[in-house]
Amino acid sequence: MISKPDKNKIRQKRHRRVRGKLSGTADRPRLNIFRSNTGIYAQVIDDVAGVTLASASTLDKEVSNGTKTEQAVVVGKLVAERAVAKGISEVVFDRGGYLYHGRVKALADSARENGLKF
């Protein structure tokens, strides 16, 4: 019998491949996204120092109830505001191996509208 492909393993493989080609610096940190079944998490990471500079997720109090896409828009806004407050205006977007569609696209568009350039 043919086994069904594990979508998460395929995504992780895609993410490893992309991460080999991009990394965040102090000048232009990496905006990383993790999407779970229930929430979405975003971090601005300086890979050289190995430090998270700003983060936001659906676990934050500012994120109210709504659809997952609406929550992703709020998370994008929060992470952009927190990054801009720390003097970060340009980032490298790391979609985490996910397709640029739906919640990932909503978060990215919201972050762009609130001051991040990528």
From Swiss-Prot:
Transmembrane segments: none annotated. One of its GO terms (biological process) is translation. The keyword Lipoprotein does not apply. One of its GO terms (cellular component) is cytosolic large ribosomal subunit. It holds the Pfam family Ribosomal_L18p. One of its GO terms (molecular function) is structural constituent of ribosome. Keywords: Ribonucleoprotein, Ribosomal protein, RNA-binding, rRNA-binding. It comes from the Bacteria. Residues 10-20 have a biased composition (Basic residues). The keyword Ribonucleoprotein applies. InterPro entries: Ribosomal_uL18_bac-type, Ribosomal_uL18_bac/euk. Residues 1-24 are annotated as: Disordered. This is one of the proteins that bind and probably mediate the attachment of the 5S RNA into the large ribosomal subunit, where it forms part of the central protuberance. Part of the 50S ribosomal subunit; part of the 5S rRNA/L5/L18/L25 subcomplex. Contacts the 5S and 23S rRNAs. Belongs to the universal ribosomal protein uL18 family. This is Large ribosomal subunit protein uL18. It comes from Streptococcus agalactiae serotype V (strain ATCC BAA-611 / 2603 V/R). The lineage of its organism: Bacteria, Bacillati, Bacillota, Bacilli, Lactobacillales.
